[in-house]
Structures are given as structure tokens and as C-alpha cells.
């Protein structure tokens, strides 16, 4: 009888040990194979899809839209100090995304933005988004085939955003994410947006800034809110269905998005869109769309456009200002 009790106790002990071992193994697998169960120390704040500067009535106010800086801090400061004459109280600068990554001094560019929040506004480009994703998902290379398991970014109009092609997240994005850290990335998430709108009450003009651009009617027609992917990564749009946008030309129906403004812009004649992103097209100044990515990172030019009211003309003037990059 005593031997039977001992054998039963031994069997129960063995079963308990196996059960505990299975639990530990399961937790190990979930912890290291599911990023949702092992998020970074702190998640980033919700990012605004659109921020507005409303009711601009000050005739002395000037706005400077700046193309892709890509971490070229020296040229950025040359633009501010030498070409613009410094950021006085009457000047607001708007960076059109991709102000970090590739160049040598992304951290300095970010610090400048955060130290001059009242005068320097920013929209996020595809590279800022990729750096933020790299921060949220330090082991990003593991999830290329399972992107839905990644920790997403949160925007005011999209609560679970994951880029369509996460294979674009590189080791360089990961290094920059670690360099900037939570403090600076969270401040950028709060300070920047995906698009910015200026309402110039004096003339009734509306100016938009978005890294990749916008199609006619975005943010102007009820319920026409562009997606984060479009605002950050678009180059083409399906001319038969404007909600379909892409970075590459998918088929013969896809056209450069700004050609829609050339054709249909009269329906929104008081609107202009400033953008970067498309260095292959270079400086691309059209009636209602202003492309300012001139490949500073490739030793070309850093381009910007100053918007200033001319009292004599009774309208806003648009002045191109550029710096040679090296």
C-alpha cells in the first residue's frame, strides 16, 4: 500500500513538472516570437493626421516650406541663417518630411526642431515613419513575413498603422531609432503631423503641406481623408479611383498624382500643395503643386519656398530659396 502511494506521488510530481515545463516553454515562445507581448518600454503618442494654422491675418507673417533635408544639418542651418536671415517671430518654417535618415546629422536636425517648436513645424515622411516603426519593433527583420504581428503606429485617423512594405525598414533606421530614443521620437510624434493646413484669411487661399502630396479634394471635401500611406509614400494614383495610390506605377491607369491637380484643380482653385518625396522629378513647380525635393542628400540642392504677402499687389508671393549641398 505504501509503495502504491509513493508511485502515485511520483507520477503526480512528474506530471506537475511536465506541466510547468510546458507553461514555461509556451511563455518563452510567446515572449520572443510575438512582439505584441513584449513591446518597447513606452509606446509613442498618437500622431495627428492633420494640423491646422487657422485664420492667418497678420500681413507680416511669412511661411517657408522646406524640401527633404535628410539629416544634412549644415545645409539646413545655412538655409535658415544665411538665406532666410534667421527665424524671427514673424517666420514659420514647415519641414515637408524626410528631414532625418541618410545624412550625417539627423540627431542635430531633430534637436533643432524640438528646440524651436513655435517656429518650426513638420510633417512626417516615409523615413520618419520607418524609424518610428524600428523603435517600436527592435526585431523588425523577424516580422517581414508576418507584419500584422508588429506593434503599429497610431494616428488620429488610423489606429493600427503598419507600412505596406516593412522590408523597407533597414538597419540604418534601427540605429537611428536607438540614437534618437523614446524622448525625441515621442516629441516628434506629438509635434509633427502627416499634413499641415494654412488658412490665409486675407486672400482666402489654403496651403497644404504633405510629404508625398495630396489629390484634389483631400481634407477639403467631406469624408475625403487621405490615408497615412498616401500622405507619406504616394507617387501615383489610379485616375479612375483616386483612393488607390502607390509608390510605383501599378498599371496604365496610374498617373502622377499632381497631374490630377493640373486637370481638376480649378474645382479647388484657392488651394496649393507643397510636398517633397519625389527627388527623381526634382524641382517641380506647377500652378497648384510645388515639389521641393531636389536631392540634397546627393549633393544637389536643398530647396525651399517662402510665402509672403505683398501689400502693393494684394496677394501672396512665392519665392524659391535654395542652398547648394555638399
Curated annotation (Swiss-Prot):
Residues 1-9 are cytoplasmic. The keyword Glycoprotein applies. It is a single-pass membrane protein. The keyword Glycoprotein applies. Not sensitive to heparin inhibition. Catalyzes the hydrolysis of inorganic polyphosphate (polyP) chains of many hundreds of phosphate residues into shorter lengths. Exclusively shows endopolyphosphatase activity, cleaving inside the polyP chain. Together with PPN1, responsible for a substantial fraction of polyphosphatase activity that is necessary to mobilize polyP stores in response to phosphate scarcity. One of its GO terms (cellular component) is fungal-type vacuole. This is Zinc-dependent endopolyphosphatase. The gene is PPN2. It comes from Saccharomyces cerevisiae (strain ATCC 204508 / S288c). Its EC number is 3.6.1.10. SUPFAM superfamilies: Metallo-dependent phosphatases (SSF56300). It holds the Pfam family Metallophos. The yeast vacuole plays an important role in Zn(2+) storing and sequestering. Therefore, the changes in Zn(2+) concentration may regulate the enzyme's activity. GO terms for biological process: cellular response to phosphate starvation; polyphosphate catabolic process.
Amino acid at each position: 500500500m505504501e509503495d502504491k502511494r509513493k508511485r502515485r506521488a511520483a507520477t503526480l510530481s512528474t506530471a506537475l513538472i511536465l506541466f510547468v515545463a510546458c507553461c514555461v516553454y509556451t511563455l518563452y515562445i510567446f515572449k520572443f516570437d510575438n512582439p505584441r507581448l513584449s513591446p518597447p518600454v513606452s509606446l509613442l503618442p498618437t500622431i495627428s493626421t492633420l494640423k491646422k494654422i487657422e485664420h492667418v491675418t497678420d500681413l507680416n507673417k511669412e511661411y517657408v516650406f522646406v524640401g527633404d533635408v535628410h539629416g544634412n544639418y549644415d545645409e539646413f542651418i545655412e538655409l535658415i541663417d544665411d538665406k532666410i536671415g534667421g527665424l524671427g517671430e514673424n517666420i514659420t518654417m514647415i519641414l515637408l518630411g524626410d528631414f532625418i535618415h541618410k545624412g550625417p546629422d539627423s540627431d542635430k536636425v531633430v534637436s533643432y526642431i524640438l528646440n524651436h517648436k513655435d517656429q518650426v513645424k513638420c510633417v512626417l515622411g516615409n523615413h520618419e515613419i520607418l524609424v518610428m516603426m524600428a523603435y517600436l519593433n527592435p526585431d523588425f527583420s523577424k516580422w517581414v513575413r508576418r507584419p500584422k504581428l508588429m506593434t503599429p503606429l497610431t494616428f488620429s485617423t488610423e489606429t493600427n498603422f503598419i507600412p505596406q512594405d516593412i522590408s523597407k525598414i533597414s538597419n540604418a533606421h534601427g540605429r537611428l531609432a536607438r540614437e534618437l530614443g523614446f524622448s525625441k521620437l515621442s516629441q516628434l510624434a506629438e509635434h509633427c503631423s502627416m499634413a499641415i493646413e494654412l488658412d490665409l484669411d486675407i486672400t482666402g487661399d489654403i496651403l497644404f503641406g504633405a510629404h508625398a502630396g495630396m489629390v484634389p479634394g483631400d481634407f477639403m471635401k467631406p469624408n475625403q481623408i487621405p490615408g497615412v500611406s498616401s500622405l507619406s509614400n504616394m507617387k501615383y494614383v489610379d485616375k479612375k479611383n483616386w483612393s488607390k495610390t502607390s509608390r510605383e506605377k501599378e498599371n496604365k491607369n496610374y498617373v502622377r498624382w499632381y497631374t490630377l491637380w493640373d486637370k481638376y484643380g480649378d474645382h479647388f482653385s484657392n488651394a496649393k500643395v507643397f510636398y517633397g518625396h519625389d527627388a527623381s522629378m526634382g524641382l517641380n513647380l506647377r500652378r497648384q503643386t510645388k515639389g521641393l525635393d531636389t536631392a540634397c542628400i546627393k549633393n544637389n540642392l536643398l530647396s525651399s519656398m517662402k510665402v509672403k504677402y505683398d501689400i502693393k499687389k494684394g496677394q501672396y508671393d512665392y519665392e524659391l530659396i535654395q542652398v547648394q549641398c555638399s
